[in-house]
Each structure stands twice: as structure tokens, then as C-alpha cells.
Amino acid sequence: MDSSESSFKAVLIHKQSLKFIPVAYTKAKKETRDLIGTVLEKINYSSHQWLVSADFKLIAVLMGLQGGYTQHPCYICLWRSREKNQYAEHYWAQRTEYEINQNNVNATFLVEREKVLVPPLHIRLGLFKNFIKSLDTDSVAFAHLRAIFPRLSNAKLQAGVLNGPDIRKLTRNTSFASFLSNEQQIAWKAILEVSEQVLGN
């Protein structure tokens, strides 16, 4: 399920890489709970119980979570987005209950949590974005990034805004790692391993 500037659509994806089958389409642009509930009803989701993959915003709607910048935006754990040491703390309690008016839950869920697939592309984009943003813009590594992506504006590159094909191009560039510091090389290797072995490439 996904929306664009002009429509919202749901497609059925076969696990053996057959063609996508569109199962729902609407010109409504906003991913509201009412719209998604109607789409699920029209495709008779309750009898099929397909696995669902979507971006994190849509997953929040499916799970009945409050939208926007909230204290607990994750549907898997109780990560506190406003915690001062949120990146220092690595383990957060699992979200076991979806009780309305607790931990940013404002409605019942439309899809069981076990039926939601974490969107690997969005995770991959976030990993690479954060890595690129951590680079010093005056470094040799950043200058090499500019050479790899001459058409990307400096602002986009500094913000780490890459798409899927850009990420593939960067991961295939064998010389990029040689411009990184030792610590950055360790982080880069870890990101590549997670990207290839966990998220799939």
C-alpha cells in the first residue's frame, strides 16, 4: 500500500517475483484511517489476511497510532522519540499492548502486527542518510561523494537524500571506503552487511 501526489493504491505482490496485481486504487491522496479501512473492506482483507508492507506513516495508521511527531512512534517497541539519549540507549521495551489512549495509540488496529512487514527500503534509506549526514562536508570522503553524484545538489547530498538506485551505485563503488577514517570504515562495513544480509539488496 502506498500513496502518491495523485492517488492511493494497494497491490498484491507474489512472493516468487511475479507481476504486481493492483487490488485497489483511489484518487484520494491522504492516507486517512477511514480511507485505509474502506480499502481493506473493499478488497475483503479480513478473509484473506495477506501480509502488508507500507511506509512507516501508513503502518502507524494501520496500527491505530497517532500521527505526527509523537512520543512513541514505533509500532514494534516503545522507543521514546523525545528522549535526550535516544541514540545511546539501544534496548527499548517491546510494544505488547495496543490500549487506546496509552503510548500514542488512538484507535484499534486495522491489521494484526504479525501481518505487517517492515519496509526494508525505508530502513535502508535511513541508514545511508544518517551515515552521509555524519560525514564532514570538507572531508575527502564527501568530495568523493560529490564526484559519484555530480547531478545531486550540494544541499541534497549534505542531507543524505539518496534513492534506491543511488544507494546501489554507492555500494558498488569500491573506492569510497578508502576515503573514510578507520571508525567510518567500520560503520560503513556494518551498514553494507545490514543492507545486504538483513534487508536484502
Language-model regions, residue ranges each:
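A structural signal for the principal folded core domain
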Residues: M1-N201
